[in-house]
């Protein structure tokens, strides 16, 4: 069985050996991703799915590998438009980058809430949080038929009520 990006037994062996396992997004994954044509919520989803899989971190391969004219054309060779950057030259962000930051903040909220709910013995709330987070995987997308946007909105609603 696969756990998102690697075989479940490989991930378990790495965990047992104390090795760090991170997840990486680049142009190989067509969906969800952070391309200029991607739904903005997919940027948050890509980070959240690292938490769902129990990974130690997330890496987006590039944020500022600009094309020749990044303000006008985000295409680079045969790669999907926007794959090489999510911020622009100068003091310019993008919706894609801001949603990526949002996903990172959500991951920290999840970490803090898990600690607090465990300390308080709030098992029901912790189970609800963990169940909602666990869906944020490629398998969860196909099993639930929910979009990345729906999953991100659901976790936001929960994080803001716990």
Residue ranges and their predicted role:
Residues 1-6:
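Short, small-residue-biased leader/transition segments that mark boundaries at the very start
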Residues 7-11, 30-34, 67-70:
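Extracytoplasmic/secreted cell-surface and envelope-processing proteins
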Residues 9-14, 46-47:
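Short amphipathic alpha-helical segments and helix-helix/interface helices
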Residues 16-45, 62:
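Active-site clefts of carbohydrate-active enzymes
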Residues 36-38, 53, 61-62, 69, ...:
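Extracellular protease catalytic domains of secreted zymogens
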Residues 50:
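Conserved, mostly hydrophobic/aromatic
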Residues 55, 71-162:
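Catalytic domains of carbohydrate-active enzymes that cleave complex glycans
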